[in-house]
Amino acid sequence: MEDAVYQEFLELEQEHWWFRGRRTIFVSLLDRHFGRDPGGKRLLMDLGCGVGGMLEQLGEYGQVIGTDVTLKGLEHCAARDFERLVACNGPAGCFGDESLDCISAFDALEHIPDDVGTLREIHRMLKPGGLLIASGPAYQFLYAQQDRIVHHVRRYTLGDFAAKARSVGFEIEKATYINFILFPLILPIVLLLKIVQKISKPDDTKAGSNVGIGIPRIVNETLAGVFGGEAKLLRAFSAPAGHSLVMVARKPGPTR
């Protein structure tokens, strides 16, 4: 990501509706598929931890290590007193075989050219019975300036996302689109912005992310409630469409 976006995310992630909503969904999925164990011995890795937006929550499930390809994000994590941090250019060689109980990749795989190779490395590092929880942006036809600013290589369909995980040996426990309630509102806005940007040709290096657009507090709170409220609905079904997606997958074998 551009350096300015790291700073922007640091300032927004605690209060902005998008960050809050997705955290609620991710925590709900981890509660159901992994279970809390604060202070326990289970070892988790957050791949592409950025400025540490999920490290505190992941600490409720065991000992968490944050990894990122850039020092900029890890510097922000260290400033927030997160201590277990590793700089590595992708997961290859970062950890030994079958050494981790859970790996999270929240909006990380879409940044990596060889996402299947990364999934293969994740599978290698997980213990038998270990869990992968991964999220990403949905639908390539929505690829726009925002994706370029944060250095996305691609966007996914849910079928493609899950198929890539299966191809390296994972069993899928849950795969769903998220941000599906607001998607009918988001979709025309994104498509309109794509048209405007195609005409105006803005400079990506000087633009901030679209999450930095200021909105009234009451609107932010409402949107956070709507997005986060999807967590309860997703206990009963998987959404057929949405602006993002999330997958919970397990490496076959008895949990150690």
Positions of PLM-derived features:
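Conserved N-terminal segment of class I S-adenosyl-L-methionine
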Residues: M1-E98, C102-F106, G117-L119, R217, ...
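Short, glycine-/aromatic-enriched active-site segment of Class I SAM-dependent methyltransferases
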Residues: L10-E11, L132-R154, L158-R166
